[in-house]
Amino acid sequence: ILIKGRVLDAEYLTPVPYAAVYIHNTPIGVVTDNVGEFSFEAPLSLKHETLVVARQKYEIQYLKLDEQLFSEMIVFMEPDNFAIRSKEFQDSLNAGSNKFASTVSKVADFIKDDWIPLGNPQTNKFDAGRIQTFPTYNPIEGLRLRAGVASNSRLSTNFFMSSYVAYGFGDHRWKYRGELTYSFDKKSYHENKFPKNKLALVYENDLYSPGEMHPRSPNNLLLITFRRSENEATYRNFAEVNYEREYKNGLAHTFWVRRSRLTPQGSLRFDYQLDNMGFNDKELVNSEAGVLVRYSFGEAYEQQKRRRKPIELTSPVFFLSHTVGAYVQFDKSHTYHRSELSAQKRFLLGNTGRLDAVGEVMKVWSRVPFPLLVYPNQRHRHHIENNAFFLNRALEFVADEQYTFRFTFMGDDLLLAKIPIMNQLQIRELISLRASYGRLSDINLPGNAELYDFPDISFEYDSVPYVEGTIGFTNLLGLLRVEYVHRFTYRHHPDALLGKIRVDVTL
C-alpha cells in the first residue's frame, strides 16, 4: 500500500518539515521533507494499523490507516503547549518576587511577534507592523517613527500588498515604501512561505547608506542605525520589478530590474572636475538588471504566521550574483558590471558552543562614482545575522575589489553556564573577529575625469586589512547582546573610534 500526504501546523496551516511518520510498533516509515510532504510503501497486512506522526514542539498524532488509504492524507499537528503551561505555572509560583522579569518577558515576546492583526485575529485581512521598527533612532533622522500594513491570504491567496510610511524628526522628511506581490502558488497566510515563487513590484523612497547597506537590502535596521553615516548617506527612491523562486532542493534565484535616484544627504556632495572646472551633481540616476543565485542544502523552515525560522543552520549557504547597470552623467550613459560571491557556514563545537563563519568577495569591473563602489558592510543577510562591522565610518574604506571575513563564536556550556543566574537567563559568551581588505584599480582612483571626488573621510586600504574584534555576552532578556568592540588596525585615521560598548538586538 502507498501511504502519502502532508503534515501541517494546525495553528498556522504551514508545512511541518522533518516530522517522523511511521507505522506503530514497526520500523516502517519516513521523515517528511522540507515542505512537510511524505510518501512510503508498506505491506498490505498493515492496513489496519495505526500511523504515528511525531515532531519536537508538537503533540504526537495517531491515525487509523484504514480510514486514510483512499486519499492523500493531511495531518494537522497541534503545537505542544507543555512548555508554555510549565512556564505559566512557574511564573505563578514566583508571581510575588518575579513580576519585573515576567513583565520584561511579555514585552520581549510582544516585540518578537512584530505584527498586530487589524481586527479579529481569526478573520483579519491586514496586519500592522513592524513593531521592531517603530520607533527607531539614528543620527541622521533623529527619532524615526514608522508604521506599516500588510495584507494576508484572507484577502487573496495569490495577491499580497504591503507598505509603510516613516517620518524623521531630525531631517523632517517623509519616507515610504509600497510593494505589490503576486504568488504563483497559493499561500496559507503570507507571500514568503517556503518555497517562494513570486513576482513583485516595489517603489521605495527612504534613507540609504552605501557604506552600511547592501544595495538590495531592505531598510529594516533596528535601534541605533546608520551610526557612522552622518554626512555619508543618501536619500534614495527606486522602482523595481523582481521575480524570486525557491526550490525544494535548496536552490533559489532572483531576477530584478531597477531604476534608482540617489540624492546626497547632509554635507555629502557629488562634486567632480572636468577640464579644470568644478561641477556638482544634485543626484545620481542609475538603472540595473541583475540575477542572484543562492544554494542551501537541506533548506527548511519553521513557518509561523508572518515569520519563517530556519531549522537547519549548519548547512553552508552560497550566493552568486551579477549586476549590469548604467548611470547617467552629462546626459551620457556609462555602463558598469558588479559581481559578488558569498558563503556562510555554522560549525557546532559540541557542548562548547558554535562558530559562525562568513566570507565574501565583491568586484566592480568598471569605472563608477564612489556611491557605486563596494564597502565592508555591504553583505547578504540570510541565516547568520548581527556580524556587521561597527567601528569604521560608513565610507571610510573604498574599493572596487573587496574581501571580507567574519567569525562569531557563541558559547554553550562554558563559564557563564556554570553561574546559576546566568544559566537561568540563558546568557552566553560572545567573541567575534571581522576583517576586510580591498584595492582600488587605476580607473577608479580619485582625480579621474568625470568621477566624483571622494569624501574627506574616505581612504584606500594600505598593505594590511581592517580588523576589529569583540568580546561580550548575548541573549540578555532573550533579545539583547552587549559587547566591547576593539579596533586593531587603521587606528591613525582621523576621528577613528578605537573601542566602544555596543548594544544590539537579536531577533
Regions found by a protein language model. Give the residues of each.
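Exposed aromatic-hydrophobic patches
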Residues: E37-P43, I74, V149
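A short, solvent-exposed loop/turn motif at the edges and junctions
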Residues: I23-N25, K47-K64, Q68-L69, P79-F82
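Conserved "repeat-terminator" motif of extracellular CCP/Sushi domains
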Residues: I74-A83, E283
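A generic beta-sheet turn/junction motif
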Residues: T14, I23-N25, L44-L46, G350, ...
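Short Pro-Gly-centered beta-turn/loop motif in secreted/extracellular proteins
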Residues: L13-P17, S39-H48, L65-E67
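Short, acidic Ser/Thr/Gly-rich low-complexity loop/linker segments typical of extracellular
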Residues: P27-E37
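Structural motif
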Residues: L2-P17
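Exposed, low-structure sequence patches enriched in small/polar residues
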Residues: R85-L507
